[in-house]
């Protein structure tokens, strides 16, 4: 924008108001709050446009909507055009949007000119409040509703003038008759005229009375319509915002769901990899019978997948039929007890792996149908596959591994379930059957079945969902060690061949027993000293944190009023700078005037000073003369005294 326009605005309005400061930055792109402050300051100082705005509109906090801002500026533009009579091309909508700063400056310049010329704005304010609007060419327009009664009044006035003209013509025609007839006729005509005029005046008064409420109603109707439109626009905007927020939430939920699915898949993949690693490790240590067991386990897993799928579908149907208020704890206990009984009986009675797996699955499926609670049992049994996989020696543990792996496969997605051996895979190594190993394994079933049951009980009672990721190298929990103590140690130690997991559990049990031994008295004292020192440090740290919290709170409390003060500092500094410049200019002017006066007085005093010096010289001369005369007088007196003295002496002689 041109700097000359800003300069003109500063010159026009700077003589009227001092606040807000008329800086180039604000005038180059004036915001609505700045214009509102200028107009309210003009009204407060000069009284121009007084009564145009209500008390609520005079406060900028109440004028925040776009429609309110536009109406505020439109009133000011109409009044300025009516008072000045000059056209204004400024549009309030463009001004509110921050466009057309030059036209905005023209409006401010016209306001300043009207205030400097002291033009009255009372009539213009009344007309604007009545609904009239100023044309961009400087003419006055009225609203369509306000024009209708005015058009009626114009027509009525025209009809009155026509009637009066007709009457005057009749009077002129009758004037040709005698004078006395004229007087009588004039008297007779004047009476009905006066009556008609009185009637017309009364009618006009009634019409005006009727017009005023109609105008008020029209204004109220327009205001209500504008408010209703604004409300509708706000409602639409709010609905659009709500829709957008809902869409964003749906997108976030979808993205979160996708992320959770990906995380679950990653976890499942990691579990599968860990299991494969453990199996590969155990496979290296075991012999050919273990390979045969793994093959048989694969076959049994296929069967178990089919049976568990049927059991799961039946349990889902049963869970929908049953009510949610049933006692879940008792049912879970019944489920765990029945499953344990069925597993132990299957381990002790049936030697073949292929026959035990489907029977256990059938028992478990029937139990699920009776109790209709599938999820807790699945979670409880989901902890034991890692334990069963760690043990590669007894056949009973392999049976457990079959059933538990089948149940875990239901929890995993279909893509991550154990896939049967494909047809394109290389042929399996030849099986070498040894009767001695099978006999020893069959003999070991009675001893190892009990240990497996204890492990299953522990997995059922554990509530930690992360136990599915059990690693062989990690130490077991205290609850597991306590239950292992319940098992007779003689049965475990007598067996020569134990699984890797049982050995690890025994080692951790021994370590735990060593840790359980009573500590030394010196260690107790050290621990007490460390605890007391730790408590002191904790108290000191908590006190420091409390002090820091209090200081932060006080800082925040003082920062808010300080920030409010800082908003007004710029305005105050600008005003003080302007005032300082004004006083500096006045000081310069007075100094120049003083120097001029001093030069004038000096020029006027110089001849007087010369005269004064001359008079002083004359005074000195006269004083010298007086002194000389006095000296002569004294000399003469001495002479006289001598002469008198000599005369006295001579007379005495």
From Swiss-Prot:
Residues 134-467 are annotated as: Disordered. Residues 1-306 are annotated as: Abolishes microtubules binding when missing. Its main location: cytoplasm. Residues 229-653 are annotated as: DISC1-interaction domain. One of its GO terms (molecular function) is microtubule binding. GO terms for biological process: cilium assembly; defense response to virus; embryonic camera-type eye development; embryonic digit morphogenesis; embryonic heart tube development; intraciliary transport; kidney development; morphogenesis of a polarized epithelium. This is TRAF3-interacting protein 1. It comes from Rattus norvegicus.
């Amino acid at each position: 924008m041109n700097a000359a326009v800003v300069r003109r605005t500063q010159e026009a309005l700077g003589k009227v108001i001092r606040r807000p400061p008329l800086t180039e930055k604000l005038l180059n792109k004036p915001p609505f709050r700045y214009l509102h402050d200028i107009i309210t300051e003009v009204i407060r100082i000069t009284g121009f446009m007084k009564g145009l705005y209500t008390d609520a509109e005079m406060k900028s906090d109440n004028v925040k909507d776009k429609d309110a801002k536009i109406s505020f500026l439109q009133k000011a533009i109409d009044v300025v055009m009516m008072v000045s009579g000059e056209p204004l091309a400024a549009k309030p909508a463009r001004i509110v949007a921050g466009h057309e700063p030059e036209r905005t400056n023209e409006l401010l310049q016209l306001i300043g000119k009207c205030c400097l010329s002291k033009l009255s704005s009372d009539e213009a304010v009344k007309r604007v409040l009545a609904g009239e609007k100023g044309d961009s060419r400087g003419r006055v327009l009225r609203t369509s509703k306000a024009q209708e009664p005015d058009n009626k009044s114009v027509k009525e006035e025209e009809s009155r003038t026509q009637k009066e003209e007709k009457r005057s013509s009749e009077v002129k025609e009758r004037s040709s008759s005698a004078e006395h007839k004229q007087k009588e006729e004039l008297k007779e005509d004047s009476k009905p005229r006066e009556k008609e005029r009185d009637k017309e005046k009364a009618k006009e008064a009634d019409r005006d009375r009727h017009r005023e409420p109609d105008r008020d109603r029209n204004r109220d109707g327009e205001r209500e319509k504008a408010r209703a439109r604004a409300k509708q626009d706000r409602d639409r905007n709010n609905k659009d915002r709500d829709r957008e927020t809902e869409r964003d939430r749906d997108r976030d939920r979808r993205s979160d769901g996708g992320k959770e699915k990906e995380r679950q898949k990653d976890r499942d993949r990691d579990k599968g990899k860990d299991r494969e690693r453990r199996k590969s490790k155990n496979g290296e240590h075991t012999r050919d019978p273990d390979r045969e067991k793994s093959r048989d386990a694969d076959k049994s897993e296929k069967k178990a997948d089919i049976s568990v799928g049927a059991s799961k579908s039946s349990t889902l149907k049963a869970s929908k039929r049953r009510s949610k208020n049933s006692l879940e704890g008792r049912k879970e206990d019944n489920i765990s007890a029945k499953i344990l009984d069925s597993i132990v009986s299957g381990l002790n009675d049936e030697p073949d792996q292929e026959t035990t797996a489907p029977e256990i699955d059938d028992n478990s499926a029937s139990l699920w149908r009776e109790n209709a609670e599938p999820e807790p049992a699945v979670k409880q049994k989901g902890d034991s596959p890692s334990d069963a996989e760690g043990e590669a020696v007894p056949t009973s543990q392999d049976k457990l591994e079959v059933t538990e792996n089948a149940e875990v496969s239901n929890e995993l997605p279909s893509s991550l379930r154990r896939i049967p051996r494909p047809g394109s895979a290389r042929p399996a190594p030849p099986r070498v059957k040894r009767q001695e190993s099978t006999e020893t394994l069959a003999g070991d079933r009675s001893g190892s079945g009990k240990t497996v049951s204890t492990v299953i009980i522990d997995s059922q009672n554990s509530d930690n969902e992360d136990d599915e990721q059990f690693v062989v190298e990690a130490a077991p929990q205290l609850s597991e060690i306590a239950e292992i103590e319940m098992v007779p140690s003689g049965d475990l130690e007598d067996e020569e061949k134990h699984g890797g997991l049982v050995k690890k559990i025994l080692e951790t049990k021994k370590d735990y027993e060593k840790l359980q031994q009573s500590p030394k008295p010196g260690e107790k004292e050290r621990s007490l000293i460390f605890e007391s020192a730790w408590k002191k440090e904790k108290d000191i740290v908590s006190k420091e944190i409390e002090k820091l919290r209090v200081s932060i709170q006080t800082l925040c409390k003082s920062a808010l009023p300080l920030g409010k003060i800082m908003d007004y500092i710029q305005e105050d500094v600008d005003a003080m700078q302007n005032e300082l410049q004004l006083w500096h200019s006045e000081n310069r002017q007075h100094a120049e005037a003083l120097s001029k006066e001093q030069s004038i007085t000096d020029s006027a005093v110089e001849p007087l000073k010369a005269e004064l010096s001359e008079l002083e010289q004359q005074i000195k001369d006269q004083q010298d003369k007086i002194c000389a005369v006095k000296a002569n007088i004294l000399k003469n007196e001495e002479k006289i005294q001598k002469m008198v003295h000599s005369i006295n002496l001579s007379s005495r002689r």
